[in-house]
A protein has these predicted regions:
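Acidic-residue sensor for enzyme active/binding pockets
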Residues: 83
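Beta-rich carbohydrate-recognition and catalytic domains
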Residues: 1-80, 89-185, 194-251, 261-265, ...
Length: 293
């Protein structure tokens, strides 16, 4: 089973008219809300400082973008950039939570911010400090009465829990690399996990010793997502197109978004840290692959 690339890829490119996004646009979070696709993308200008831009579209392929970033470095710990946004809609609470990586010369910090309108964001705080930790994403509902989030302590995917999104604990490893496989060096979370009757469908990325990124998927227990139910040996996508193979980071495809609309999974991804592409598949097909593949 493989994802199907959109023929019009890439769907978002750098905009030379705006300095803050003139060099690279990539690694985006996307949600579908009120009939629209809302995209939050990482952008870089010639200063290589990452900022987060916003774009919106009705069909999932064509987007109109704001001319100014909606999130940019303001704190010392994010002086070199705010990166790789993943956005979760907490529908029962009427708010959205963005997980993003703050970068400074002092290291990286996995941060959370919240919004009620998708444009104005208020920082909540970090998942953890003082360690190399990123690729975090919030689950779309509480599990056992607590918020849950994936994160990455290299080289593995971990999970953590919180009562208030500010204080995190109960850290548990979910899964790590597999020797001699496509995900042999490290793994990291993808977009927001998808709840199904068979478990949490969790797309993720893997990285091998030849420095190639690929996408995979696993199935996790609904009430204990640290328990892996199934993890196929094969991947669902690898770099093939020229713009996926050549760029700021060669052979890199990186997804932080997989919204489901009318039974279709839309997988948005950065291509070689330069542009944004889209691939898709039927949710039923992806779930079957995760269970049986």
């Amino acid at each position: 089973m493989k994802l199907h690339r959109y023929r019009g890829n890439p769907i978002l490119r750098p905009n030379p008219l705006n300095e803050w996004e003139a060099l690279n646009v990539f690694n985006c979070g996307v949600i579908h809300h009120n009939g629209l696709f809302h995209m939050f993308y990482r952008a870089q200008g010639t200063d290589y400082v990452s900022r987060i831009g916003y774009a919106v579209g009705a069909d999932g392929y064509n987007f109109n973008r704001l001319q100014q970033p909606i999130l940019f470095p303001q704190e010392p710990f994010e002086s070199r950039g705010v990166e790789d946004p993943r956005v979760t809609h907490l529908g029962e609470e009427g708010r959205f939570v963005m997980a993003y990586t703050a970068f400074s010369l002092g290291g990286i910090t996995p941060m959370f911010a919240e919004s009620t309108n998708l444009i104005a964001w208020r920082r909540i705080g970090p998942l953890v400090t003082g360690e190399d930790n990123k690729d975090h994403v919030l689950f779309p509902r509480k599990i056992g009465g607590r918020y849950a989030a994936f994160h990455r302590r290299p080289p593995s995917i971990w999970i953590a829990y919180s009562d208030d999104l500010r204080h995190w604990g109960d850290f548990q490893v979910v899964m790590g690399p597999r020797s001699e496989e496509w995900d042999s060096k490290r793994v990291g979370g993808g977009g927001v996990p998808i709840e199904t009757e068979h478990g949490w469908l969790a797309p993720y990325h893997g990285f091998d010793h030849e420095h190639t990124y690929r996408f995979g998927v696993c199935l996790l227990d609904l009430e204990d997502p640290a328990r892996v139910i199934a993890r196929p040996s094969g991947f669902i996508m690898e770099p093939q197109e020229l713009w996926e193979l050549r760029g700021e980071v060669p052979r890199a495809i990186f997804s932080a978004a997989n919204p489901v609309v009318d039974g279709t999974v839309y997988v948005y991804y950065g291509g070689a840290d330069r542009v944004i592409g889209l691939a898709s598949c039927a949710l039923a097909e992806l779930l079957e692959f995760a269970r049986r593949g």
